[in-house]
Structures are given as structure tokens and as C-alpha cells.
Amino acid sequence: WIMGHMVNSIAQIDEFVNLGANSIETDVSFDKQANPEYTYHGTPCDCGRDCLHWENFNDFLKGLRKATTPGDSKYHEKLILVVFDLKTGSLYDNQAYDAGTKLAKNLLEHYWNNGNNGGRAYIVLSIPNLNHYKLIAGFKDTLKSEGHEDLLEKVGHDFSGNDDIPDVENAYKKAGVTGHVWQSDGITNCLPRTLKRVRLAIANRDSGSGIINKVYYWTVDKRSTTRDSLDAGVDGIMTNYPDVIADVLSESAYKNKYRIATYEDNPWDTFKA
């Protein structure tokens, strides 16, 4: 999965997919009542990027729906996964459940079109704070009560705070999550970071007894870091330059080992070589 980083305006969806991304990451900010408000990152952000692209959240969802609905004039067949980077740092811990509820209602109406030929992409809810695990329950309970529990098959999870893996597992246990788990590791492209924790996450993924199904590393903009990540065995790479990742994947060392994921590749299945 080549994951376009910080795709916060509708125009950027086309831009990143056309550069080679089959997945995008979108920032979601919340208002004081825990309603998802904007797709917006703000300053500071990654070096070399404009931090100020934004849409109203529901407008972005409608644009995303068009980009992931077969038959639509804006449809991109290869856009198959969306990571919502949920900026819950502005919320109190006791608002996490409400945030999940409101997020689910917005997605149900504006992305899934109330279950009537909505967008088809898989969705990862990425939460920065382990204490906000109740967001997951709020989201799931809402889809169930609205009669759309089937859509949970399209939803996965990530805790993005670079916490110790056992602590992440414990948060999932409290949230009642047993699958559909992506594990991120990384830091802004302005700073270096080793692959030490990525390797721990990959070991958990491959152990057969861990909770992690997929591992992605962010933010990777250089060919050398891309190669290091692929050598470590990641499933996804988040990048500001999808074309760089696509280039490296076509190199002789990688083109027979890796391929770009398609809609038929279940993002919740742990890959076994």
C-alpha cells in the first residue's frame, strides 16, 4: 500500500492517486462537541508541504465517495484504502465515545450513502491516544444501532502514538478489538527515526499470536528509507511522494517480492509468503 500523506482537500485526492498512491491519509479535526469538523492538519507539518489545505469534513467525504464509487466520473479504481488520522488531542478523554458516534454517523451518511452504493474503500480509524479507545466502541455501536453492522467489515484500526506494542495490545483488549489492526510507526519527514519499533511490530504481526495484521511506516520520502522499509517487511509506506515509492517497487530487488495492492487484497489479512 502506497499511502499518500496529508491528503486534506478534494483536489489532492486526484493529485496523489495520479502519482501512484493506492491509499491516502486524511487528517480529521474535531470541534468542542466532538463533531468531526475539518480535514485539516495545520502548522507545523512535514517539511516541504503546504500544511493549510482543508475541506469541511462532510464535503471531503462526498468527494472521497465519488473517487471510490465505481461508475462515478471521478472514480479511481486503484484508491482502495483511506486512513483517517483522527486529531483527538483537542478532546477530553470522556468525549472519545461521542467522537466515535459522530464520526460513524457522518461516514454513514456522506461516505457510505446510508448503505446505498456508497464508496467502496476500506477505512482505517487512526487514533493518536491509547486512552481514547472508546472511540472505537462509539463507532461500532452506532453502525450497529443504525442497522449497518455489515459496514464494519470495511473498517480497521490503528493507534498512531508510537506506544509500546504491549500497551497497544492492551488498549485493543479494552476496546474489544480482535482483528482489522494496522500498526503505524514513524515521525515527520523533518526528523530521522530508526526502524527498531517497526521491526517489533512486524515481529508481532508474524508471530501468529499478536494482534497486528499490517504494519506501515511514515513519513518516507527518500529512496534509501523506502528500501530499508521494504527490507524490514512493511505492508505500507506513507509518503509525500508516491512516485518515489512506486519507482523503488519497480527496482529489480523488489519487483518480484512486492506488488501494489488492489481491491481484491483484503487489508485485514496478515500476509503469509
From Swiss-Prot:
InterPro entries: PLC-like_Pdiesterase_TIM-brl. The keyword Magnesium applies. The active site is at 5, 41 (nucleophile). GO terms for biological process: killing of cells of another organism; lipid catabolic process. It is an enzyme of class 4 (lyase). One of its GO terms (cellular component) is extracellular region. Signal peptide: none annotated. Expressed by the venom gland. Dermonecrotic toxins cleave the phosphodiester linkage between the phosphate and headgroup of certain phospholipids (sphingolipid and lysolipid substrates), forming an alcohol (often choline) and a cyclic phosphate. This toxin acts on sphingomyelin (SM). It may also act on ceramide phosphoethanolamine (CPE), lysophosphatidylcholine (LPC) and lysophosphatidylethanolamine (LPE), but not on lysophosphatidylserine (LPS), and lysophosphatidylglycerol (LPG). It acts by transphosphatidylation, releasing exclusively cyclic phosphate products as second products. This is Dermonecrotic toxin LruSicTox-alphaIC1c.
